[in-house]
Amino acid sequence: MAKPNRVDAKKGRADRTAPAKVRIEGRPAQAGRELAPAGARISRRASDLLRAGHVWVYASEIESLVLAEEGDPPALLPVADSRGLLMGTALYSPASQIALRMVAREALSEAAWLELIEQRLRRAIERRVGLILSPLKGQSDSCRLCFSEADELPGIIADKYSDLVILQLLTKGVSSNSVRDVCVRVFRDLLKPAAILERPDPRIRELEGLDAPSTEPLWPADANNSKSATQFHLNGLTFHYDAGAGQKTGAFLDQHANYAAAEKWASQMAPGGRALDVCTYQGGFALHLARVSKSVTGIDASRASLEVAERNLTANREQSQLGTRVQVDWIEADAFEILRDWSSAGEVFDTIVLDPPAFAKSKRAVEGALRGYKELNLRALKMLRPGGLLITCSCSHHVGWTQLEDAVRSAAADAGRRVRLLARRGAAPDHPVVLNLPETEYLKCLVLEVD
């Protein structure tokens, strides 16, 4: 058995002689007792957060590590508090700031962890079937199947687009063939997809120190007989998905309930009006608004996204899901520049949707993000007719509800407009929020009437 390598996380050095004082599974601490075969001792602050239901431990909160000298660091680590009491088992990510992600409140072997993945993944999928796929059958055939920590599976994200399942394995602790095999088995058993593909998030995998996985399909194994593109449906509308392109894992499934809500609000407040969808991506809000508006304009900086939006428009016209009388235009432009020009030129709309990408991917970026949100909302407010509808979104976790509302309030003051809050909305229920883990809440959507 390899000798333990005791690492002082704060000093960044290895001490192979100092004993590791820790209690394993609640037994009294004894000098020289090792974390077997490896383990982490964390600060009191981190321990308190875990006891309150959080599941993350940052690298700066690890007081010491005991790791085997030989081989790669293990995927699973026992975690003890500062007194040496076992708190459970975590996935270990040595290259990440989030070094530990708790997966159980007891000691856990790798075999037991794989069994737990299967149980939790099955439960997550069954929950989506009950919440979305069964109630919306015939209208929506796509949703997020697994949402990482929100489903007690840190680093595992899976989306269903009609007959395709797209998997992301984003942490070192789950980026293994054994985990892939479990996921594929569950997807095939419960969903019977035409294909299962892994499409990583390069930015997150880089933070985790992970190489890009194979681009070959996970199932079927023969790439020549595997499909990578399909049509899927949300709220009775048709969209295209291509696994070889697109942001995130493809489309923004987290907005699908807000798409329907936007259509409903516009039908009540601005039927037959003129609508604008800013940062339209592939036309999600725009196509829903087209069912109740006389004309819709979608703006995006990505030509590739707008080409897909046009394909989506064509498909819905061909399938009679959209009338031929509604005018839909796509404009490739920077949102800030075109809104500034249009608001100065006196353009007027009945409905405006703002759905920009995340402006704040870290706390340091929040101040600049708030300036961006204020500017977009200011320009939109100047272009809305009295009684018009503004739907403004933020997908930045680091920007809270109060900060977003303050930005809109400040924009309204500068524009000389009075805004009435009609609804606060978040992500669809397939992207659940865990109250013990605030990081699972990121999408914020305000529905406003503008006087």
List each model region and its residues.
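Non-catalytic substrate-recognition/targeting regions of SAM-dependent transferases
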Residues: 146-159, 179-252
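Non-catalytic accessory regions of SAM-dependent methyltransferases
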Residues: 1-162
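Cysteine-centered catalytic environments shared across enzyme families
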Residues: 112, 118-141, 166-216
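Rossmann-like S-adenosyl-L-methionine
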Residues: 220-451
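Short glycine-rich, basic-tinged beta-strand/loop micro-motifs
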Residues: 162-171, 388-395
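Mobile, glycine- and charge-enriched loop segments
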Residues: 58, 165, 270-274
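Short, isolated positions in well-ordered beta-strands
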Residues: 87, 166, 238-239
